[in-house]
Amino acid sequence: MPRALVATIICVVAAFQSGCSRPSIKIDGSSTVIRITEAVTEEFAAKHPGVRVTGGRSGTGGGFKKFSNGEIDICDASRRINEIERKACEERGVDFAELQIAFDGISLVANPQNDWCDCLTVEQLKAIWQPGSKVARWSDINPAWPTAEIKLYGPGTDSGTFDYFTEAIVGKTGACRPDYSASEDDNVLVMGVEGDKYALGFFGLAYFEENKEKLKLLGVDPGDGNCTKPSEDSVRNLAYKPLSRPLFIYVRTSSLARPALREYVEFYLDNVSKIVRSTGYVALPDEMLDRSKQALDEALVAIPVQ
């Protein structure tokens, strides 16, 4: 079964279908985490035919809106739920389990023809991306660099990657200059940076790994003179500052009463470390994955099986 792309539907259908309705699972959220979820679903499909899993990528913020409205069972998230989203869930009676599944690094990328920049400091990145930025050309960052206009690419405002990047770099979630090319589809961002010599963009590390022949990976200096690029080691040990981040799935507790959903989430946690490595992300240490499994067990305790 091919992996789904934007707002696609992954359907797992039994070979001989009766007239009964099929169990269904609805997932939406982060375009970063959906890559892991698609891979998990593909393996789940082979072992559990007859379950229909629908998956979309509205971005972390868009996913939480649907989650708090009770429209989906699982929200893929590239950041933790914020207080506004948490309150929306509480007001609508949506209880949930927060399950960390992996680590990721936000990659800072340029066009391969860029031969003048290998690293940017957090201070420089803030100057580029903050609201009201006066940085329009590469030479505005460093007079020795080209006078050509910087073409900026990044995720849209519903993206958890956007939220995490703006908080880590600018200092406030969502604070960003508006004049950049935005997309919730990271593949669109890859194509944008690939097609413009003077481009600069950011998105999840897995998308760089998948397209490394088309892009140049830049390092980030947090201000201590150490320029670090994201890698499995630098992300896991948080040496890649400040753009290493945890990835999550949020599961609606009431949905766990459905055997198909419960089995899917258990399968997810049992197989995610293997799958994460194959999709370009960074697996959790065993003790952290065990905490996610414990959180799921605690959520299951009081749930009656349907």
Q: What annotation goes with each model-predicted range?
A:
Residues 20-306:
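Flexible loop/hinge segments at secondary-structure junctions
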Residues 1-5:
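Positively charged n-region of N-terminal signal peptides that target proteins for export
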Residues 6-17:
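Bacterial N-terminal signal peptides
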